[in-house]
Amino acid sequence: MSSQRRVTGLRKKLAMVLAIAFILLMWQIAAWSLPDFLMPGVPTVLARLWGDIQTPAFRVALWGSLTRLGGGYGAALLLGIGFGLIGAVLFFFREVLKSAIVILQSIPSIAWVPLFLILMGFGNLPIIVVVAIAAFFPAALSVMNATESVQQVHVSAARVMGASRWSLLRRVYLPAVMPELITGAQLAFGNAWRALISAEMLVGFGKGLGRTLSYAGETADMVGVMTNILAIAILAALIDQVILENLKHRLLRYQYV
């Protein structure tokens, strides 16, 4: 199994490298086909990115975005996992929550921004709340859907042995839903990241990668636009493929041995 795991890991890395190469190739072909002021080439943007990441302004924007992401994404995971597990032992609560999520998740995350700006004013809090809303739905749904597939024989056996609802959640449901929970966390991150960048662009307040991208667009700085898009994509890939994937393998190590 360990050799199979290594082969699978190598295939995933190769697929990622090929995907990046394909994207860069298509980008460069587009740059050759259009004037420089409309589509700068890959080398130009990479050189600009290398220069930008060494500036204090970039570090301030990066820290601002990561701070908002951490607050919103962390809150969403805690609430989503908590409510999802509660739904495992409270059937009516689960059905009400799932119905509410079906209704609310159809609303684009960016549509919440004006509401929370009016309620909370300018600052980090409305962006954090929007990020939390965007990430909450996949986190909660993944846990609730996973709890429905838990074998009832295990639940019944635990109840026969006198397990309380808390014990059921901690010793039966949580271990059983862990794989789906991690997958839900990755889906939630994608939602959170998109909501963060969109909200920062719309709010136009404070420092962040979304605000930096918006400013580049306002000043018709196409190199700056592509540089910020590239920075946003690279950072998202690093968080998802390095941090979250490694965490996934550590938490689910028993499945790979």
Name these PLM-found stretches.
Residues V102-P138, N145-A146:
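Generic hydrophobic transmembrane alpha-helix motif, especially the helices
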Residues S142-L181, G210:
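Short cytoplasmic-facing helical segments at TM-TM junctions of multi-pass membrane proteins
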